[in-house]
């Protein structure tokens, strides 16, 4: 996939997104959204490239949506972080100089952080052997990165299979492990703005928080400092393990994390059936005043949406404003929008991240 890059059009496209969000939320008497912009370039902390062979050489390539046969060959990527742009030509030089690193290499993924960490994943159509491992270990030292080699049924790790990010929220620095292959917010600067907005919107509370779709604990860590205790759910095993590490690394000890889907937790809270993963957790001991949701693009299913209606405050981060509006429509008879925001996670595309605080009428 390629992303059009036109900094001169940035202000106009951000205003178009803001107008679109206003229009979607207008039926619900929403206040004017706070708008959080993005850096105009070098904002994307991860990038995935297929490699295209031409003139006996391999080039970084991306493809336009719907066309996987016409490569766009790249020397650099202006939307990607400066670290990725610095690594791209050096890595290419190294694989061109090394038959071991070059042979049947077909994809390269980069993951970086604002804190300066970097990881490269090199994917192959062949088994990786000791010769590859020796060359990769030398490469990782030269580039000062963690490096992962992947082939079918094989994953070799040099360094770590995660990067470490550090983000400041209300004067406190939180450290995050971001595992290879797991979801992370791609725009680190805007992610920091989202965390601070959510922290401020939740406010200081004397009750408990339910969090659905907690991922690696991106929002969990700062929000846990605002409440008595948190019950958080996540279905991805990789994300659950990362979240547990992040809670421990940051000394956050008032969070209970369960590996359940939002739909399963709804059944548990409605006492439809017991869940083995909830053994030892007394759901009745929680005094939930707020729920935080950050669902996938499909939004909340109707049952989960009904579950959130029980809460005085619903803090909702959305990557799809259309499904956000549909969920608000379901809740509007009992909750009103007190705050809303637009976060420009994805400049130069139609995608937008938004947030709303819904409060019971």
From Swiss-Prot:
It is an enzyme of class 2 (transferase). One of its GO terms (biological process) is tRNA methylation. GO terms for cellular component: cytosol. The active site is at residues 319, 353. InterPro entries: MeTrfase_TrmA_AS, MeTrfase_TrmA_CS, SAM-dependent_MTases_sf, TrmA_MeTrfase, U5_MeTrfase_fam. It holds the Pfam family tRNA_U5-meth_tr. Dual-specificity methyltransferase that catalyzes the formation of 5-methyluridine at position 54 (m5U54) in all tRNAs, and that of position 341 (m5U341) in tmRNA (transfer-mRNA). This is tRNA/tmRNA (uracil-C(5))-methyltransferase. The gene is trmA.
